[in-house]
Swiss-Prot record:
Ca(2+) 2 binds at residues 67, 70. Residues 19-52 form a propeptide. One of its GO terms (molecular function) is hormone activity. It is found in: Secreted. Keywords: Biomineralization, Calcium, Cleavage on pair of basic residues, Disulfide bond, Gamma-carboxyglutamic acid, Hormone, Metal-binding, Secreted, Signal. It comes from Sparus aurata. GO terms for biological process: biomineral tissue development; bone development; cellular response to insulin stimulus; glucose homeostasis; negative regulation of bone development; osteoblast differentiation; regulation of cellular response to insulin stimulus; response to vitamin K. GO terms for cellular component: extracellular region. Residues 53-93 form the Gla domain. It comes from the Eukaryota. This is Osteocalcin.
Length: 97
């Protein structure tokens, strides 16, 4: 049993040594670390999603904002003069949807 364990350890050591030697022989041009931190625009756009402009709110969403804003008299007054979106944004922050 000890002989089997010794042979397994020796074979693992041999595999590790040969795999380290094969990875060290790559040319410098294939190393991604040498490319730097800048990438082309088309490659970067595949990784980072662009923010989209907010779409049009539906009547149900606007009614929901109106119901929240009606509970505050100042918000309700601003809603009548400036509009529901401006009033909600001023008193409650960005629209959640």
């Amino acid at each position: 049993m000890k002989t089997l364990a010794f042979l397994v350890l020796c074979s693992l050591a041999a595999i590790c040594l040969t795999s380290d030697a094969s990875t060290g022989s790559q040319p410098a041009s294939d190393n991604p670390a040498d490319e730097g931190m800048f990438v082309e625009r088309d490659q970067a756009s595949a990784v980072v999603r662009q923010k989209r402009a907010a779409g049009q709110l539906s009547l149900t969403q606007l009614e929901s904002l109106r119901e929240v804003c009606e509970l505050n008299l100042a918000c309700e007054h601003m809603m009548d003069t400036e509009g529901i979106i401006a009033a909600y944004t001023a008193y409650y922050g960005p629209i959640p949807y």
